[in-house]
Amino acid sequence: MKTNPLPATPSVWGGSTVELPPTTRDTAGQGLLRRVLRPPISRRDGPGLPRGSGPRRAASTLWLLGLDGTDAPPGALTPNDDTEQALDKILRGTMRGGAALIGSPRHHLTRQVILTDLCQPNADRAGTLLLALRHPADLPHLAHQRAPPGRQTERLGEAWGQLMEATALGSGRAESGCTRAGLVSFNFLVAACAASYDARDAADAVRAHVTANYRGTRVGARLDRFSECLRAMVHTHVFPHEVMRFFGGLVSWVTQDELASVTAVCAGPQEAAHTGHPGRPRSAVILPACAFVDLDAELGLGGPGAAFLYLVFTYRQRRDQELCCVYVIKSQLPPRGLEPALERLFGRLRITNTIHGTEDMTPPAPNRNPDFPLAGLAANPQTPRCSAGQVTNPQFADRLYRWQPDLRGRPTARTCTYAAFAELGMMPEDSPRCLHRTERFGAVSVPVVILEGVVWRPGEWRACA
């Protein structure tokens, strides 16, 4: 039996004539997709209708798919109601969505209006790391909850009070308590901890930059008092990583007097956002060299490949020698494998906190059940006992020996905490670019590290003890 092939264009399927648009007809791969969704031998109207009966009234295909430009209700089938037109619109939308996804990587921006006491974007540059600070009025209450017995909990409130006297809202401290929650520039935080870094010259350059380029006549006093706040937080076990979190990488800003509206990339590629500056339309992450650690190079680990970025706080809890440092660490180690590497890198701090972390704490009362008397209980046949299956039964469990030790002055996980880290993001390139150079901030030269291709992906804090 001889069969005639179906015409290409215009095509006649089931009595309807459709001509495909040239752009859609010529697109590679669409012919195969059309054959899968609509075989050429399929009938449009299904089984034949009885003679004398009209076509069924059904919802338009485009209307059901939400692709019909008109808002008309479902009606009779029309020449425009066919699978080919619906398929054309679906394919065009898919192609546009894929092109948009490839052309512009997804990133998320966040904006906040802040006081410029601890963050002045005019002095820093696009790509500077910003941290969000919890409301300072909450910190004295946290100190009363978390400080061990014997610690001076009022020290934290006094330190923040002195800091507020050197800020823009110092005159209203008695009425408002403390200023509202705001942002802390990573450069300002490093400048406040400058005395604690090993690279002292580079840290002093960051402090000189903040002192010279931040507006105000009491910037130096503000740095000293903020440093005292950090030490008081370590003293009262209100650790800085518990009240600070990643906010984003600075992109653009608008300032007026003591206020600033800052925009930052909080997730996604840092370089995907436009800065609005003609000279530097894109921003790479810029960090002080004294606060950057290439962990793989320090420990001789890894090779070429993508790397993670971590924000790390370190603490020393020895009495009257408390300190706090902040770093950005690059490593190929995932979060679950970073803690052993930090223990090796900051092992001296871990030992110091384990030995001296309980100093200046109220000691336990003498002979107050210091140890669990397991040997004596096991040797005494009259000691109440029960089987493992009877432990959940109050009739047997209530007769067991109750050990009530005095844990005051004893080492705990908080007294031994020497570091805390949180994932910031990653550098997905096989060979991440870390450029070490000296940048001019006004009249001050600061050694910096520029990280290219950073993708922000912030995570939760993890304490190391």
Curated annotation (Swiss-Prot):
Keywords, alphabetical: Capsid protein, Host nucleus, Virion
Molecular function as annotated in GO: DNA binding
Region (Disordered): 1-29
Record-level GO BP terms: viral capsid assembly
GO CC term (a single one): viral capsid
Highest taxon above the source species: Viruses
Pfam family, one: Herpes_VP19C
Compartments in which it is found: Virion; Host nucleus
HAMAP family referenced in this protein's UniProt entry, alphabetically: HSV_TRX1 (MF_04018)
Assembly information from the UniProt record: Interacts with TRX2, MCP and capsid vertex component 2/CVC2.
Sequence similarity: Belongs to the herpesviridae TRX1 protein family.
Reported function: Structural component of the T=16 icosahedral capsid. The capsid is composed of pentamers and hexamers of major capsid protein/MCP, which are linked together by heterotrimers called triplexes. These triplexes are formed by a single molecule of triplex protein 1/TRX1 and two copies of triplex protein 2/TRX2. Additionally, TRX1 is required for efficient transport of TRX2 to the nucleus, which is the site of capsid assembly.
Name used for this protein in its record: Triplex capsid protein 1
